[in-house]
């Protein structure tokens, strides 16, 4: 808990001195305030005594023990002007009671000056870098340099704070954000197009096959057919080039099932006409198209074209597929026999 509070203070104020004296209260509570003050004063007295003995040997030899004690008492006031002693755990060997054998004339080592890395300067240096690759490389170099200049005193909990981590928000490049936004916009734009294109691909095959008849009105098709018939009568165009039923492919590729054949035979018997089987088949097919409720506009155009081009369809069918006539005759014969 204490370390977290010191960490927060060190981050908020990088120049604070709380880390230098973080262990002083713990040591005082452990040894007691009176014993600590007496021991520090005795250490300061011995330190000042050794310095004075080196500077003035003659005066030290002529002085008596009483004079030495009085000099020690008079120099106790120097401790108020000196810097506080480091009280880290690895310095606790000095806080041994005075009656122990380790109480030698060993002077107290001055505390090393601490080299602290300012987190704000590190963040400022990282924020000045331009690209993401260079920032990663420079951050690695700065971390290596920061390890090289680590302080000698390791007692502080503030040492080891990864202050360069506060510049990580700079690593999130704006280019990545722009690419993500562009991808989202492209997905939003392509989704309605795909939804519109799917029903177009799944449209009715009958409408796709009859696109020519659906695109043009019936009046236009009838006028075109009349013009072709006039050209055929004058001998300018051969009858082989005349498409039957306005290019309706379903008329020639109609599924030949037994039910359809029976329907054709029934229509032939009910009409009682002496026309050819192909002509009766065309008439029955046109009637079935007219009676169907779906695609009424397309069926009426197909029926009108059937009635106009009925004299020519037999020739076209015989020339295109000569086996169809024999097949129809055999099917009609089998239906009559049944």
UniProtKB/Swiss-Prot annotation:
Regions of compositional bias (Polar residues) in chain numbering: 307-316
Pfam families, per the entry: MBR1
Region annotated Disordered, chain positions: 50-75, 267-322
Single biological process term from Gene Ontology: aerobic respiration
Family: Belongs to the ISF1/MBR1 family.
Functional description taken from the UniProt entry: Could influence the NAM7/UPF1 function, possibly at the level of mRNA turnover. Participates in mitochondrial biogenesis.
Protein name (record): Increasing suppression factor 1
Species name: Saccharomyces cerevisiae (strain ATCC 204508 / S288c) (Baker's yeast)
Lineage, highest ranks first: Eukaryota, Fungi, Dikarya, Ascomycota, Saccharomycotina
Gene: ISF1
């Amino acid at each position: 808990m204490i370390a977290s509070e010191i960490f927060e203070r060190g981050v908020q104020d990088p120049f604070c001195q709380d880390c230098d004296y973080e262990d002083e209260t713990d040591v005082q509570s452990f040894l007691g305030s009176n014993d600590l003050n007496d021991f520090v004063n005795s250490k300061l007295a011995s330190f000042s005594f050794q310095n004075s003995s080196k500077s003035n040997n003659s005066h030290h030899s002529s002085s008596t023990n009483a004079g030495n004690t009085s000099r020690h008492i008079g120099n106790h006031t120097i401790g108020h002007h000196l810097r506080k002693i480091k009280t880290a755990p690895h310095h606790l060997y000095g806080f041994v009671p005075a009656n122990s054998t380790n109480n030698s004339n060993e002077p107290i080592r001055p505390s090393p000056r601490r080299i602290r890395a300012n987190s704000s300067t590190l963040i400022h240096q990282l924020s000045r870098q331009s690209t993401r690759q260079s920032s990663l490389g420079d951050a690695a170099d700065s971390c290596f340099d920061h390890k090289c200049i680590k302080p000698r005193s390791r007692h502080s909990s503030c040492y080891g704070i990864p202050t360069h981590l506060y510049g990580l928000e700079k690593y999130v490049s704006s280019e990545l954000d722009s690419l993500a936004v562009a991808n989202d916009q492209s997905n939003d734009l392509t989704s309605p197009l795909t939804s519109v294109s799917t029903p177009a691909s799944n449209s009715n095959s009958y409408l796709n096959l009859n696109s020519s008849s659906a695109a043009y009105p019936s009046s236009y098709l009838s006028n075109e057919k009349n013009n072709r018939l006039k050209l055929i009568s004058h001998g300018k165009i051969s009858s082989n080039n005349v498409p039957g039923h306005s290019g309706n492919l379903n008329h020639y590729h109609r599924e030949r099932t037994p039910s359809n054949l029976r329907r054709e035979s029934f229509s032939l018997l009910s009409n009682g006409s002496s026309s050819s089987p192909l002509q009766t088949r065309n008439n029955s097919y046109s009637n079935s198209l007219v009676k169907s409720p779906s695609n009424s506009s397309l069926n009426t155009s197909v029926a009108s074209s059937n009635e106009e081009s009925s004299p020519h369809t037999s020739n076209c069918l015989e020339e295109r597929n000569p086996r169809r006539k024999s097949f129809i005759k055999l099917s009609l014969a089998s239906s009559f026999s049944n």
